[in-house]
Every structure is written in structure tokens, then in C-alpha cells.
From Swiss-Prot:
CDD domains reported for this sequence: BRE
This protein's name: BRISC and BRCA1-A complex member 2
Modified positions (N-acetylmethionine) in chain numbering: 1
Subunit structure comment from the entry: Component of the ARISC complex, at least composed of UIMC1/RAP80, ABRAXAS1, BRCC3/BRCC36, BABAM2 and BABAM1/NBA1. Component of the BRCA1-A complex, at least composed of BRCA1, BARD1, UIMC1/RAP80, ABRAXAS1, BRCC3/BRCC36, BABAM2 and BABAM1/NBA1. In the BRCA1-A complex, interacts directly with ABRAXAS1, BRCC3/BRCC36 and BABAM1/NBA1. Binds polyubiquitin. Component of the BRISC complex, at least composed of ABRAXAS2, BRCC3/BRCC36, BABAM2 and BABAM1/NBA1. Identified in a complex with SHMT2 and the other subunits of the BRISC complex.
Keyword annotations: Acetylation, Apoptosis, Cell cycle, Cell division, Chromatin regulator, Cytoplasm, DNA damage, DNA repair, Mitosis, Nucleus, Phosphoprotein, Repeat, Ubl conjugation pathway
Residues that bear Phosphoserine: 2
UniProt key word Nucleus: yes
Protein source organism: Pongo abelii
Entry-linked Pfam families: BRE
Region listing for UEV-like 2, in residue ranges: 275-364
Single GO molecular function: polyubiquitin modification-dependent protein binding
UniProt keyword Cell cycle, yes or no: yes
Region (UEV-like 1): 30-147
Xref: InterPro entries: BRE
Length: 383
């Protein structure tokens, strides 16, 4: 159910509270997922004109789980705060004295429900942390992370028994990694979706037993960051080492991700330098180039009255990864009607060269390769 459809069924006096939650509500670390409501119902009599829904189920992301809490208002007394039922978490009994926004409920503030929900989630986090006492090993993992503010202040935990019959205990740690994404080129962060949310990297580590013999890490990137770093398959984090600890493993993942970000930033500046050098060396031979991301360049050149194009594709992780040169005849066609072309990656190249050196080496390579390309075009292409 879309937020607009849900809100149209809510009692008008309660609608501002719920609207603030579903339209602007960001609770917890996973800011890429908005809160949503389902199971709208009414406690009013059948004679009450609609819309009159005043109770619903709130879905919230937390530590890789989805919390489903029932929120119950009374449409007849909309100035009163709601009741909460915490679904499967029957053991969760929040401390009313710590719920300041519930005790001083202000119905004139549209965000009062959202503020109460945030307070409840904070208490729920403490409730989950307390459950780790059932495992000294998992408690150690938690306490060592807690001693590091960059991790301890950005962590969610979900713990509990996997199997009530065997007593197996499991836990999941979700951490917001302290990685700086602010210098990623803006062109890489475009066109993902209209409201991408916060740029964030979340590391989920699941302990399937109390002795940490089965540990499964997974990295989650917000959509813009995943796109900027080359897609979901571009970053592979190491397996959790046998006998390892989170306090050692998490910095390794941070370091890996930071290096990946630096590669992308460096690649952008190096590509810009590369294209600037080619503009200088080839002048009017430049047909077009990508002036935003500096990922493509096309040259129109001539060798002994033979005109040809060179398309240069610069990869995301340039200069570590070598550009592809595609030579294309302007006269000859393939059987499918395409201009005859050959792609080359086997040419003199070093990632240590600056843009000027790369342009000079490319010009020299063009002179040696074009004769055989021309011969191949005449032999295999059609005029």
C-alpha cells in the first residue's frame, strides 16, 4: 500500500502524526528504507463516517530485521497519545520514565509520534544488547566495539534464540561504517532515484552460534554509493577469519572500502588529466569527449589519406585499469552494416605515466598500428 493510499484512510485528526512518520520518518541506521504502515483498522463504530482508521502496524528496519509494532490511537480522542503492542517482542517492556515525548505528548506537534517511536527504538536497542549476556563471546564482541565511539555509537544489535527446543543462540551486528563519501565525483551520484537518502555503508555480521564458529558478514551500500563504486559486484569483502573478532575485522572492511573510494576519486582526476593531455596533443582531431565523467574520447585522424576514428574508453578504476582503444574505419563496413573496427588493449601502457606521457605514447602507437589496421579493413571490410 502506497503512503498516499494509507494516509487517505486515516482519521483526519490523526493524519499529521502518521504523515510525518511515513513521509519523513528515518529511524535507525538504515536510512535508505522509509517507515511504512499496514493493517489499517478502525476502533470506531460502523456509524462513524470515514475516513476513520486509527490503528495500524508500523514496519521499521532494525539490524537487518523488520520490526512490526501495532500503534493504537482513539479517533474519538485524537489528543491522547497512542498505545503500543510490540508484536513478537513480548519480553520488551520499555521504561515509561525514559519516554519523555510520550509523557509530554504534544498533539499540536506533527512529529510527536515519530519522536516517541525513536525513543522506543533506543530502548529496544538496549533491550537487545542486554540479551547478549547469554553469551560471553558475543558480549565481548559488543563491549569491545562499544569502547570505540566510531563503532559503538553507530551500531544495532538483534539477538535471540534461533531454536527454542535446542536453545541455539544467534546475534546480528549492524554497523554504520565511518567511511567518507563526500569527495566522490557528483556525476557518479546522479540518476539513481529521486530520493536516494543518506550515502551510507552498513556492515552486517551474523553470528549463528555463541562460539562464533559460523559468522557471515555482508556489506550493504546505499544506492548512490553502490552505483558510484561500480555496482554490487565490484566490492568483495573478506570472509570473517576463524577465531577473529569484530574489533579487528570491521577496520579491515573500512580500510578496503576507503581504498575503493580513493580509487574512484583518483580515477576521476586522472581521467580528466588524460583527456586534457589528448586535447592538447591532438587538437582539432578531437571529435567529442565526455566533459562530465571523462570516460570517453573520440579522435578523427588521418594516415596517408586513410581516415579513421579512435574511440578511447577509460574505465572507472583508471589508471589501474588500462583504457580500451577501438580503431574504426570511416570507409569500410562489416556484413552487418557496421563500420569495421578493432579493439586494442595490448599496447604500451603504464599506470605510473602522467597524462602527457600517455598521450605521447598513444600517438606513437597509432603510427605503428594504423598500417596493419588499414590492411585489415581493406581485407575484411566492404566499401
Amino acid at each position: 500500500m502506497s503512503p498516499e493510499v494509507a494516509l487517505n484512510r486515516i482519521s483526519p485528526m490523526l493524519s499529521p502524526f502518521i504523515s510525518s512518520v511515513v513521509r519523513n520518518g528515518k529511524v535507525g541506521l538504515d536510512a535508505t528504507n522509509c517507515l511504512r504502515i499496514t493493517d489499517l483498522k478502525s476502533g470506531c463504530t460502523s456509524l462513524t463516517p470515514g475516513p476513520n482508521c486509527d490503528r495500524f502496524k508500523l514496519h521499521m528496519p532494525y539490524a537487518g530485521e523488520t520490526l512490526k509494532w501495532d500503534i493504537i490511537f482513539n479517533a474519538q480522542y485524537p489528543e491522547l497519545p497512542p498505545d503500543f503492542i510490540f508484536g513478537e517482542d513480548a519480553e520488551f517492556l520499555p521504561d515509561p520514565s525514559a519516554l519523555q515525548n510520550l509523557a509530554s505528548w504534544n498533539p499540536s506537534n506533527p512529529e510527536c509520534l515519530l519522536l516517541v517511536v525513536k525513543e522506543l527504538v533506543q530502548q529496544y536497542h538496549q533491550f537487545q544488547c542486554s540479551r547478549l549476556r547469554e553469551s560471553s563471546r558475543l558480549m565481548f564482541e559488543y563491549q569491545t566495539l562499544l569502547e570505540e565511539p566510531q563503532y559503538g555509537e553507530n551500531m544495532e544489535i538483534y539477538a535471540g534464540k534461533k531454536n527454542n527446543w535446542t536453545g541455539e543462540f544467534s546475534a546480528r551486528f549492524l554497523l554504520k561504517l565511518p567511511v567518507d563519501f563526500s569527495n566522490i565525483p557528483t556525476y557518479l551520484l546522479k540518476d539513481v532515484n529521486e530520493d536516494p537518502g543518506e550515502d551510507v555503508a552498513l556492515l552486517s555480521v551474523s553470528f549463528e552460534d555463541t562460539e562464533a564458529t559460523q559468522v557471515y558478514p555482508k556489506l550493504y551500500l546505499s544506492p548512490r554509493i553502490e552505483h558510484a563504486l561500480g555496482g554490487s559486484s565490484a566490492l568483495h569483502i573478506p570472509a570473517f577469519p576463524g577465531g577473529g573478532c569484530l574489533i579487528d575485522y570491521v577496520p579491515q572492511v573500512c580500510h578496503l572500502l576507503t581504498n575503493k573510494v580513493q580509487y574512484v576519486i583518483q580515477g576521476y582526476h586522472k581521467r580528466r588529466e588524460y583527456i586534457a593531455a589528448f586535447l592538447s596533443h591532438f587538437g582539432t582531431g578531437v571529435v567529442e569527449y565526455d566533459a562530465e565523467g571523462f570516460t570517453k574520447l573520440t579522435l578523427l585522424l588521418m594516415w596517408k589519406d586513410f581516415c579513421f576514428l579512435v574511440h578511447i574508453d577509460l574505465p572507472l578504476f583508471f589508471p589501474r585499469d588500462q583504457p580500451t582503444l577501438t580503431f574504426q574505419s570511416v570507409y569500410h563496413f562489416t556484413n552487418s552494416g557496421q563500420l569495421y573496427s578493432q579493439a586494442q588493449k595490448n599496447y604500451p601502457y603504464s599506470p605510473r605515466w602522467d597524462g602527457n606521457e600517455m598521450a605521447k605514447r598513444a600517438k606513437a602507437y597509432f603510427k605503428t598500428f594504423v598500417p596493419q589496421f588499414q590492411e585489415a579493413a581493406f581485407a575484411n571490410g566492404k566499401l
